[in-house]
Amino acid sequence: MITEGTMSTDTRSRTWTLPGLEVTEVTLPVPLDHEDDTSARLELFARIYADPEGTDRPYLVYLQGGPGSEAPRSVGPDSPPWLARALREHRVIMLDQRGTGRSTPVGPDVALPEGAIDGAATLREATPAQQAQYLTHFRADAIVRDAELLREHLGVDTWSLLGQSFGGFTTLRYLSAAAASVETALFTGGIPSLGPDMESVYRTTWEGMAARSERHWARFPGDRDRMRVLVDRAEAGRLRLPGGQKVGVERLRRIGMLLGRSQGQEQLHHLLGLDPDSPAFAHDLAGALPFGGRNPIYAVIHESCWADGTVTDWAAERAMPGTVREDPTLLAGEHVHRELFTEDPELQVWAEAAELLAQHPWPRLYDEDALRAADVPGAAAVYYDDAYVPREYSMATAALLPRLRTWVTSEYEHGGLRSSGQGVLDHLLDLAKGRREA
């Protein structure tokens, strides 16, 4: 059954059902620039999932990892796997963060909101400087202000947050800027460092990925030779994706992203075991490369999520150790590099904007005094060997939050919220509510 209605001017709602779920969709206007009352308006989209027996339960907002990825699309109570556990105590809001999904997505040929950029109907038509300026409005600070408008629209004083990866960064910004609106804060693999020293964070992640690479080669010794064959092909311009697109050495190195996932070693082993001339290999390689045209925000302003009052200046490239630079079998993880924007035809449109954004002076995201004063209960899953968000930085930041309880575990990789089924969320809800000690 579907019912539709209008909740206020320019705001739309629709309610429908899935087996075991009641689904309400909400769309409302939000300013592109929250500091400008005359700013162009984006559309903000969210789906609210409820157990049919619990349509009055408090809200839990899921903040997706990324940046640049939309919220999951549920097809039932177990999709994603943790949803059923959340619905026992909450209604769950799946928020498409601005620029993703149905929230005025960023793309070269997507129609821009009226008045967003003078003289341009799409970002492809805009100058690189205009593209860059537009994209400065898609960080966690703006996402939090969007969420606050949604909260006010729904008429609730407080709600709880569940932040996965970059969603945890956004949750921390929420506690810094609007802690009074937060009932409970849950983090999974997503507590960032504070301050401008991005290079040290990336240096740590490079060292971690080098160690993961060596562990993989030790477990599957033949894989290193297969990787060297691929490196030789890449250097010769003979490594290609299904459409004929060339893959260079640095882009190839990013298949190391697999090593930060559950069963990632096995996935990498299977990929390297394929005949490099086969269609299967070309397609699977394309699927394993982390940065691409589907979610351009993830590539173009990725490093800005770590920028707490600094310029990024290609921090991951600058922090790459010499030993890694000299050995292409030491793989990369979530490390953006310039060649992405020349090799990938879908990212070429963003190349000049990416250079400009790398020199943009990003404002601070976090206020340490506000975090120390945040009287909000919470719990965090900190993964001991997290490939993307180093544990030591997460723990230092967590120590600022007076009511946050941390659970350090080596049982899961960065995506433990999903791979654990209901396990990680169940643990955090109990920890935050005082139903367990650790």
Each PLM stretch: what is its role?
Residues S8-P242, Q348, L365, D369-A370, ...:
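Gly/Pro-rich cap/lid or specificity-loop segments adjacent to the active site
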Residues A374, A379-V382:
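Short beta-strand/loop motif that positions the catalytic acidic residue
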Residues L271-G273, P390-A399:
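Short alpha-helix in the alpha/beta-hydrolase fold that links the catalytic acid
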Residues G264-Q267, D386-Y393:
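Conserved alpha/beta-hydrolase "acid-adjacent" motif
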Residues G237-P363:
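Alpha/beta-hydrolase fold active-site neighborhood
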Residues V182, L401-L404:
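Core-facing hydrophobic residues within beta-strands of well-ordered domains
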Residues M1-T6:
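Short, Lys/Arg-enriched N-terminal segments with co-localized hydrophobic residues
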Residues L371-D375, Y388-V389, A398-L400:
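A structural signal for short secondary-structure junctions
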